[in-house]
């Protein structure tokens, strides 16, 4: 890429705004039919990351027009308390979606607890059944909000996916695997990379789109990319030395070399609550079907 060519910064705010405006109209239609979409957030303790995302969810809900309630359990909550909480949320006909703030504290068996959440109210792909539906490409499956935010961002900026070689760095059930499945469903040719991948540099350079969700600050630098690529950075890491949030991509190194990239913060993360809202509205719409 010549020094005269500027790479495009793919910001999340315009994507979230477009989704929010569309959802607000859908919520008005639901309210006219006597349905007010409602999300319940289940949070154990007061981790700062959880509280930050919770505030963002409330802000998005206000813009879209649906209700949110938080059930806060103490840090030392028992397994039984957590299980019963999900039972109650599942049984409440006025609740359409539930967002469990994960990971749970060490003393809680997350898998056991989430078996008590009704899959139709799972709006962030926390349950095994919703994850399976996402990985299998089942119509109507609600994938992890962050994974779907990646697709929403690529669509908004009209990044071609059909037939395109795409590399995903990371294979977690929260982002890596689901985003690979979503991309594959769009007929991209997907390679999933991880810590055991041989010659990661060569693999990534062959891709037209690279999605990085490894959870390691500045893992991907200039050596891993080439001109013409679109780089999607899903990572959110705290850089203690710089005292700021950074991604899994070293943006200073990578941005001048590629065609397009997402910033951190301000990229994928800012679309995630809009996808959460979309899922809550979709769950509410299904109650009328």
Question: What are these model-derived regions, one by one?
Answer:
Residues 29-39, 45-63:
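N-terminal glycine-rich anion-binding loops that anchor highly charged ligand groups
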Residues 61-76, 190-192:
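Short beta-strand elements in bilobed, periplasmic/extracellular small-molecule ligand-binding domains
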Residues 97-161:
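Anion-binding alpha/beta catalytic cores of soluble intermediary-metabolism enzymes, centered on
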Residues 81-93:
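Short, well-structured alpha-helical segments in soluble
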Residues 44-58, 140-230, 234, 239, ...:
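Glycine-rich phosphate/diphosphate-binding loop of Rossmann-like nucleotide-binding domains
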Residues 1-35:
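Positively charged, low-complexity intrinsically disordered leader regions
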Residues 101-107, 216-218, 236-239, 267:
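Short glycine-rich anion-binding loops that position phosphate/pyrophosphate groups of nucleotides
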Residues 111-132, 235-288:
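Rossmann-fold NAD(P)-binding glycine/threonine-rich loop
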């Amino acid at each position: 890429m010549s020094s005269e060519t500027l790479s495009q910064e793919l910001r999340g705010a315009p994507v979230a705004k477009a989704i929010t405006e569309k959802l607000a109209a859908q919520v008005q239609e639901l309210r006219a039919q006597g349905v007010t979409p409602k999300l319940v957030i289940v949070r154990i303790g007061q981790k700062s990351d959880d509280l930050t995302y919770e505030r963002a969810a409330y802000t998005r809900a206000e813009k879209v027009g649906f209700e949110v309630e938080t059930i806060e359990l103490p840090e030392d909550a028992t397994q039984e308390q957590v299980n019963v909480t999900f039972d109650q949320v599942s049984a409440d006909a006025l609740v359409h979606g539930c967002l469990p703030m994960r990971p749970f504290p060490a003393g809680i068996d997350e898998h056991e607890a989430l078996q008590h959440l009704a899959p139709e109210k799972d709006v962030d792909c926390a349950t095994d059944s919703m994850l399976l539906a996402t990985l299998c490409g089942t119509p109507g499956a609600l994938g992890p909000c962050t994974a779907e935010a990646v697709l929403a961002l690529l669509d908004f900026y009209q990044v071609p996916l059909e037939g395109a070689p795409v590399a995903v760095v990371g294979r977690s059930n929260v982002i890596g695997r689901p985003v690979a499945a979503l991309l594959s469903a769009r007929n991209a040719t997907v390679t999933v990379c991880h810590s055991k991948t041989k010659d990661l540099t060569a693999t990534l350079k062959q891709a037209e789109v690279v999605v990085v969700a490894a959870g390691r600050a500045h893992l991907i630098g200039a050596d891993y990319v080439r001109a013409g690529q679109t780089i999607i950075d899903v990572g959110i890491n705290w850089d203690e030395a710089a005292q700021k949030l950074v991604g899994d991509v070293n943006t200073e190194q990578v941005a001048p070399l590629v065609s397009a990239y997402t910033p951190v913060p301000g990229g994928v993360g800012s679309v995630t609550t809009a996808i959460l809202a979309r899922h809550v509205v979709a769950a509410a719409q299904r109650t009328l079907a």
